[in-house]
């Protein structure tokens, strides 16, 4: 085997054995330059909760769709079926486009594709659909990806419809920026019980060095409440409430910290 061919073969083997290396390869294809995964992206790519779920609370523009698309490609390589839900059709098309881009960095071939569905020669399928109880029934999946979970309409109805589609041992990946406290995604973080088969990841914009300039720009342009929600990933009381619930909770707390002001 010529040296160049051997080098290519070894590089491809490394990516197959190391999902993070594969993810970085996909990013480089998309960005047109070398890319390195953030620590949280490594955690999300490697997260393995058979029969359970991983919930990712992530700031805007941090790269969560890249992680979800990579999880989709990894499942295609195994010949599995992935269902990806998003609040709107535009978002389903965008993540399908990203999966198609990443597939060009693999040895798989596409047998059939539409704007929201891809089938490969491994027998795997990636299907992206707008999240409504009516459109998602009837599928069976090995993996479920829910993008912008906090923004789903009728979220409890949608989740109730989709969870029975998972095969035994199938995994769910919820990803979103927070959008208030009164939704399914918020309850995953606020009401989690220790016995739940659920892994929680929180990624604030202030924790990502490559986003430092953008974070400072948003700090000056967004209201304090919006910055806390969009960048710091806090679950803020819904806009209908005149007072932020966290302020009310602190004011009514009987702890010394709440009663005695600090100067």
Give the location of each predicted region.
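Conserved Walker A/P-loop ATP-binding site and its immediately adjacent core
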Residues: 79-101
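Inter-Walker segment of RecA-like/P-loop motor cores
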Residues: 93-142
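Walker A/P-loop
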Residues: 50-71
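Hydrophobic residues on the short alpha-helix immediately C-terminal to a glycine-rich phosphate/catalytic loop
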Residues: 48, 67, 71-75, 95, ...
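ATPase catalytic-site recognition across NTP-hydrolyzing enzymes
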Residues: 205-263
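Pre-P-loop entry segment of helicase/translocase ATPase cores
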Residues: 1-53, 261-262
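ASCE P-loop NTPase helicase motor core
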Residues: 97, 101-103, 143, 151-222
